[in-house]
Amino acid sequence: MTNLTLALDAMGGDHGPQVTVPAALQALRLHPKLSLLLVGDETQISPYLSSAEIDVRSRITLVHTTEVVRMDDKPATALRHAKNSSMRLAIEQVRDGMADGCVSAGNTGALMAMAKVLLKMLPGVDRPALVSCLPAINGKPVYLLDLGANIQCDYDTLFQFAVMGSVLSEAVDKIARPKVALLNVGIEECKGNGDVQQAAQLLLHTPQLNYAGFIEGDEIYSGKVDVIVCDGFVGNITLKTSEGIARLLVHQLKQGLAKGFVVRILARLLAPRIQKVLNQMNPDHYNGASLLGLRAVVVKSHGNADEHAYIQAISLAYTEAKRRLPEMIKDRLESILLDINS
């Protein structure tokens, strides 16, 4: 396999190089064929590199800049004025062919605006979609999109999201003919607004997609489908609510295991199994939201991601670049549109 290079916005997120650089080093250890461009303030990045092994350090290139997009910057402002920011320069590395993908924990709106302008959209895609992986009861991953990039979506946009989500599931998890569903207020054919209804009709008449109909919120984690499509308003609320509930359950489980002598003894005996369950429930385990529909790979990490979570985002970008996800989406869309228009 040929080597891959990712550009990292090392200054992005709540913690900057304190998290991004140690995570980058660990990602390089996990992926021997990976090289990284660390974009940011060299004086802040370099101290974290001093103890790295020679093999790891040799696969890092620094791209120096002191400018940073703030988390409260408006997308239009960042696009116009942050010309030398670590976020923009990281994306430009991809645009200029120096990197195969980009990872940032910075301002989501600014990242989307810059990526859309600098990398452009794939033919047949009107808007980029944010998509992330969720856990399911049966252990399979479930992809939910859109997560907030597009508050309102017409039926054609929802259809495009379904295609892109299906290809993502195939590429990353190697699932043959992933089941795709539309998130709705009921499973009956008559339920939902006009755009959801029209998107359903398009999907029903697209044999290249394995459309499974409507799905309700209480079935998101059932594992019955592989891809769930909705507009960004619904998707963002769903994701944030899920993360909050997961943290609540982890907190309550830890509290419950700390009460009572017998319970504490059992907790120690079952510690490895309990920790595995806690890890599976932890939202950081699924960190990394992909911006689908662009001509190159861009992954958005949580702004407050810790080192482990940021490694997940880097690994996701690595997998998507290795599988050539944008090219797969482009080819699938072209094939489907050809069938529709024939």
UniProtKB/Swiss-Prot annotation:
EC number(s) from the headed UniProt entry: 2.3.1.274
Primary location class: cytoplasm
GO cellular component terms, A-Z: cytoplasm
Swiss-Prot/TrEMBL catalytic activity: a fatty acyl-[ACP] + phosphate = an acyl phosphate + holo-[ACP]
Residues spanning the membrane: none
InterPro entries in UniProt: FA_synthesis, Phospholipid_synth_PlsX-like
Pathway field: Lipid metabolism; phospholipid metabolism
Pfam families registered for this protein in UniProt: FA_synthesis
Record keyword Transferase present: yes
Example GO molecular function: phosphate:acyl-[acyl carrier protein] acyltransferase activity
Location relative to the cell: Cytoplasm
Keywords associated with the record: Cytoplasm, Lipid biosynthesis, Lipid metabolism, Phospholipid biosynthesis, Phospholipid metabolism, Transferase
GO biological process: fatty acid biosynthetic process; phospholipid biosynthetic process
Function recorded in the entry: Catalyzes the reversible formation of acyl-phosphate (acyl-PO(4)) from acyl-[acyl-carrier-protein] (acyl-ACP). This enzyme utilizes acyl-ACP as fatty acyl donor, but not acyl-CoA.
Family designation: Belongs to the PlsX family.
Subunit-structure text: Homodimer. Probably interacts with PlsY.
Protein name, UniProt field: Phosphate acyltransferase
Gene: plsX
